[in-house]
C-alpha cells in the first residue's frame, strides 16, 4: 500500500524519491547491493523512470556486472535517448577488457559526442577504443582535439605517444613521452613507454 501524507493524499512520488535517496546514499557509501534493492523497490512503483534505471545500471557497473549494467543503460536510453552519461558509461562497460567489445563501445562514445561535441572525456575514451581496434590515426585525431584545448594533459599526451608507437613512428612517440617527463619527471608509465619505443626503434634498425 502506498502511504498517505499529512493531507491524506498518497505519497507515491515521495516514496520513489525516498527510495531513490536511500539508493544514492548506498551508492556513495559503496553498498551497491543495497542500492539495487532500493532502486528495485522504487521501480516497482515507477518502472519507466529513466533516472532510476540509469542509477541501477551504475550500481551494476560498480559491481562489475557489465551485462546487467548494459541492459539497464539500454532501458534508460529507450526512455531518455539524450542521456550523455548513459552512452559514456555503457561504452565504458563494453570497452572493459573483460568484455572486449571495443567496436560497440565506439558507437556509444560517438553517440555521446553527438550530444556533447568535443567533450574531452568522451573523446579520450573514443580515442582509446580506436587505438584498441588498430585505428591508430583516428585515435590520434581524437587526442589532438583534446590537446588543442588541454595541451598539458599528460594522460592524453601519453595516449597519443602510444598510438604513434603502434604506427611505428617511434621518434615522434619518444618526443611525446619526453614532453610528459618534462612536466612529470617521475611519471613511470611515460618512462616505461619511452624505453619500449627506444627498444623497438633499435630492433627495426638492426633488421
Task: Please identify what each model-predicted range represents.
Residues 16, 50-51, 84-85, 120-121, ...:
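Helix-start (N-cap) detector for alpha-helical repeat units in TPR-like alpha-solenoids
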Residues 13-51, 55-64, 95:
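Alpha-helical segment of the N-proximal tetratricopeptide repeat
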Residues 10, 41-44, 74-78, 110-114, ...:
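Conserved structural position within tetratricopeptide repeats
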Residues 28-38, 62-75, 97-111, 132-145, ...:
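Structural signature of tandem alpha-helical TPR/SEL1-like repeats
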Residues 2-18:
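TPR-adjacent "capping" and linker segments in tetratricopeptide-repeat scaffold/adaptor proteins
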Amino acid at each position: 500500500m502506498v502511504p498517505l501524507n499529512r493531507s491524506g493524499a498518497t505519497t507515491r512520488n515521495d516514496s520513489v524519491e525516498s527510495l531513490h535517496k536511500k539508493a544514492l546514499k548506498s551508492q556513495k557509501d559503496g553498498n551497491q547491493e543495497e542500492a539495487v534493492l532500493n532502486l528495485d523497490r522504487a521501480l516497482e512503483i515507477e518502472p519507466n523512470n529513466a533516472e532510476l534505471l540509469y542509477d541501477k545500471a551504475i550500481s551494476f557497473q560498480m559491481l562489475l556486472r557489465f551485462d546487467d549494467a548494459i541492459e539497464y543503460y539500454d532501458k534508460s536510453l529507450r526512455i531518455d535517448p539524450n542521456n550523455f552519461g548513459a552512452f559514456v558509461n555503457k561504452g565504458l562497460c563494453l570497452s572493459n577488457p573483460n568484455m572486449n567489445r571495443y567496436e560497440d563501445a565506439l558507437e556509444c562514445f560517438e553517440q555521446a559526442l553527438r550530444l556533447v561535441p568535443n567533450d574531452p572525456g568522451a573523446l579520450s575514451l573514443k580515442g582509446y577504443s580506436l587505438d584498441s581496434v588498430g585505428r591508430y590515426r583516428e585515435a590520434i585525431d581524437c587526442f589532438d582535439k583534446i590537446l588543442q584545448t588541454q595541451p598539458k594533459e599528460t594522460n592524453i599526451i601519453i595516449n597519443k605517444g602510444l598510438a604513434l608507437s603502434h604506427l611505428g613512428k617511434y621518434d615522434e612517440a619518444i618526443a611525446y613521452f619526453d614532453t610528459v617527463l618534462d612536466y612529470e619527471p617521475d611519471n613511470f608509465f611515460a618512462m616505461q613507454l619511452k624505453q619500449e619505443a627506444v627498444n623497438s626503434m633499435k630492433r627495426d634498425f638492426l633488421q
